């Protein structure tokens, strides 16, 4: 199972991605969680300590590694489009609570048509994770839709779009569904977060097709408290973990995932 979790900034996608990863790891399944967000904080949500996280350099920032694998140098305009990457998750990933974390980062100067060495490297790594790893792979994507335009997540089993009860968030889901279709990804599901009341629930149900809605997560200050204390929501909030467990069960029931 290979899932890309996406959504607008601040909607709670990292909390969802990290807790989902912890739930699969608790079952004894091999889990790889890849942080593809420039504001990398998936590690904290997984339960890593700050000292370990401070020692991690995103793959996209490892200039020597990128040069070594792609052959790209300052004076060389040519580089390999198919670099060796199959050893990178095990060599550079860090493990905590049964989850292997791989911090990929992003190519800040990317854009829709970027074919720079760093982008080639990241796309190859994600492609390897999606097509060749036997692990449960959960990608915590950068906020927005740029990664869809670059085709970075091509080949995943599904996109899970985390949204809030609001028109702009719903529009993000619609845009992801349209762009995912262009990448050949048929499964686009929704998790509604920060739901406060019946009015919010009705708003979500009236705008998201029932077959696409995996579930709702209710607004919970324990998530904020966990973040303040640098703890994983999985370890801090039984309520949040229970709600995401129900969503996970629905994911598991879907044979296409």
Question: Which residues does each predicted region cover?
Answer:
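C-terminal alpha-helix
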Residues: 243-257
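Conserved catalytic-core segment of NTP-binding enzymes
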Residues: 26-27, 117-216, 221-225
């Amino acid at each position: 199972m290979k899932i890309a979790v996406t959504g607008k900034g601040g909607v709670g996608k990292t909390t969802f991605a990290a807790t989902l990863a912890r739930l699969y790891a608790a079952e004894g399944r091999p889990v790889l969680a890849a942080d593809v967000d420039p504001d990398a904080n998936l590690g904290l949500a997984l339960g890593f300590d700050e000292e370990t996280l401070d020692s991690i350099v995103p793959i996209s920032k490892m200039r020597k590694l990128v040069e070594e694998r792609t052959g790209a140098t300052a004076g060389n305009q040519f580089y390999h489009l198919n670099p060796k990457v199959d050893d990178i998750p095990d060599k550079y990933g860090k493990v905590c609570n049964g989850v292997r974390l791989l911090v990929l980062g992003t190519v800040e100067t990317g854009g829709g048509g970027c074919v720079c060495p760093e982008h080639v490297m990241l796309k190859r790594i994600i492609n390897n994770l999606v097509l060749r790893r036997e692990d449960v792979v959960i990608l915590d994507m950068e906020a927005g839709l740029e990664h869809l335009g670059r085709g970075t997540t091509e080949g995943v089993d599904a996109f899970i779009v985390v949204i809030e009860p609001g028109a702009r968030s719903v529009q993000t889901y619609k845009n992801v569904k349209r762009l995912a279709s262009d990448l050949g990804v048929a499964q686009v599901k929704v998790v509604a977060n920060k739901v406060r009341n019946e009015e919010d629930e009705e708003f979500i149900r009236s705008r998201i097709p029932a077959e696409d809605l995996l579930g709702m997560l209710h607004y919970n200050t324990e998530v904020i408290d966990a973040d303040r204390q640098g703890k994983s929501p999985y370890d801090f909030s039984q309520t949040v973990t229970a709600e995401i467990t129900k969503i996970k069960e629905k994911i598991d029931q879907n044979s296409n995932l």
